[in-house]
Amino acid sequence: MIPVGLYEPLNALKPVAPGLWLADGPAIRMAIPGGHIPFPTRMTVVRLADGGLWCHSPIAPDAGLFAAIDALGPVRHLVSPNMLHYAHIAAWKQRYPDAVAWASPGVRERAAGQHIAVAFDADLDDAPPPDWAETLDQLHFRGSRVLEEIVFLHRDSGTLILTDLIENFEPSRLPAGMRLLVRLAGSLDPDGKAPVDMRLTYFGRKRLARACLARMLAWRPRRVILAHGRCYLQDGEAELRRAFRWLA
């Protein structure tokens, strides 16, 4: 696999705000026409009001990461935010059998098509369940004909948690050939956004996406966490407007 600069240290909890952490993982191989490219991975951990932990898009299992998470509290929820982010939930469910595994739109069908066995316990919706409504808000970002995503807001810190709706790859972490490809896709830092192939899946349905964007902007996020690339740890609302200008 082509080498790509990762966000070391890997498999370590990195505080973002009180009760909110990131953990960066190894690269994965993402299929594109004609081959594969490496993607850095990242998960988010939130401490809920009851002291339990909420794990968004769990990365590859790692003993050191498990130990660090266990020191924070009991894992109660394992979240697949979209149908591309689910591959490690089965391993995490094995480690935390009492945790509830939450399915995103289309993920059950996607996992079955990839012959990956994942047992989900509940489905994500357009509003937060009582399990975490005090700590997190959420919405179902609609409009794509291919990939819909559940978006979350950490209420206390004003942190928006996205997965693939924005990708923001730093040029210094990419080999030259991949840098050009990512620039053409429109996902190169500092002007990261959804890649062009994903934006095209909203053709004829942008009205749905604009309504979802309006809800996110109404949250007035202060920072934006991304699964792939550099996060926006300040000016979150402005970065959100910039990254979604293609919906205009």
Give the positions of each predicted feature.
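Active-site neighborhood of phospho(di)ester-bond hydrolases with catalytic His/Asp-centered motifs
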Residues: H56-S57, R76-N82, W102-S104, I161-T163, ...
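Catalytic core of the metallo-beta-lactamase
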Residues: M1-P58, I116-L184, A211-C212
